[in-house]
């Protein structure tokens, strides 16, 4: 019996959650009207190449189950395959910190307790309470919280976004003052000022993770037509919504007053009180809704990305104890190690950056540079596929034959290199006395992270550690569409009786 194929809309819905990146709107706002240029650049010249190349690799015979781990292992060898899945997982450990900073920014307004967002010690304690509370809530299995994640996405992400867009539209139509200049010169950044370009990395972050959905092209009806169409629709929607969201923040909050972790709440406060001074309570309600929504998103990240590392453990690439799960199919040892790493990142970023905008910017840049190393491997693998493994059968091809494939992948590869290097330039939005701190935290953290998977691979004795299960990729029906694609993970947790933790 043939499995029912995904329609264009069904496939689009699997990835649509990535178009609402509310917590990035304040960072987008720091680029003022340049945000439109950066969104177009990232969407057309980075997101689409990643999406198209991933789709072709996902349909190669023998590559359909393993995701990026399988793709890289099949071409560059197991060592680099492990590194790719490691980077895909490790970037999330930094991403947790960024997300929780955003939650703390919202809660600081609700509780009227600004120290929660500005004092490094209090902020770090708040981060630990939220992160570990959400981590332990996931040990009972992700099925228990799946409905909560969906509710959080609707209540805390979709509804506030609609309200924000509506308020901003009313504000602009009313002819009210706007905090940023609007003219023909304001759209294109000054490329001679490198410090104004570094914010581009946050726009790349908004597009990351689409490769996790590419595997579902094997379930899509008429993929040659529908897959590119779905990706084009997705990028148009992402550019439109992110442009509106970022502009809404930039237009009403002066740049010098903008908090990257609480900027969305600042915007709601300004807009709501502009229309009615008696609705301060409504701002707190919306802030609480947003905190709830992002908490739901963070909770969905706890288990998802560790699935790839669990697949590596089941291939014998990690110590045996990392194959352990509890009865709810949660890889507890991996999740606990992940928690320790997040705690360390939280300490480094919060105390190293002083708990202010610097901490948030370093966290975003570090997330991006870690993920970009994985994407560089991704594009290298694609070049190997189209030049050295042309004989491998596949059901989808990037348009343009070998020349078109080379140009499309080449653009994505070069833009990845550009974003990687530009990340280390201190942004124009931070004070001059903070530039050295920004570079040192980012550079040291990046170097340690870049060599870590290769050290782990070399030190772990892989003799006698046979593969107990090959990775099994998610089908479309296994995916919770409310979860951001980069945080879902791509593989099932294959539970073995002998590897279940005993109480």
Curated annotation (Swiss-Prot):
**Residues annotated for L-glutamate binding in this entry:** 33-43
Query: Which InterPro entries did the record assign?
Result: AA/rel_permease1, APC_superfamily, Glu_antiport
Q: Where are the transmembrane segments?
A: 35-55, 153-173, 194-214, 232-252, 366-386, 407-427, 440-460
Instruction: Please list the GO terms describing molecular function.
Output: antiporter activity
How is this protein positioned relative to the membrane? Multi-pass membrane protein
Provide the Gene Ontology terms for cellular component.
plasma membrane
Q: Where in the cell is it found?
A: Cell membrane
Give the signal peptide range: none
- RNA-binding keyword on record: no
Explain what induces or represses this protein's expression: Expression is highest at onset of stationary phase in presence of NaCl and glutamate, and at low pH. Chloride-dependent expression is activated by GadR.
Give GO terms for biological process: amino acid transport
Keywords (alphabetical) are: Amino-acid transport, Antiport, Cell membrane, Membrane, Transmembrane, Transmembrane helix, Transport
> Is DNA-binding a UniProt keyword of this protein?
no
Mind telling me which Gene3D superfamilies this protein's record contains?
Answer: Amino acid/polyamine transporter I
Catalytic reaction list: 4-aminobutanoate(in) + L-glutamate(out) = 4-aminobutanoate(out) + L-glutamate(in)
Going by the entry's taxonomy, the superkingdom of the source organism is recorded as Bacteria
Question: Its family?
Answer: Belongs to the amino acid-polyamine-organocation (APC) superfamily. Glutamate:GABA antiporter (GGA) (TC 2.A.3.7) family.
Known function: Involved in glutaminase-dependent acid resistance. Exchanges extracellular glutamate (Glu) for intracellular gamma-aminobutyric acid (GABA) under acidic conditions.
Name of this chain's protein: Glutamate/gamma-aminobutyrate antiporter
Q: Which gene encodes it?
A: gadC
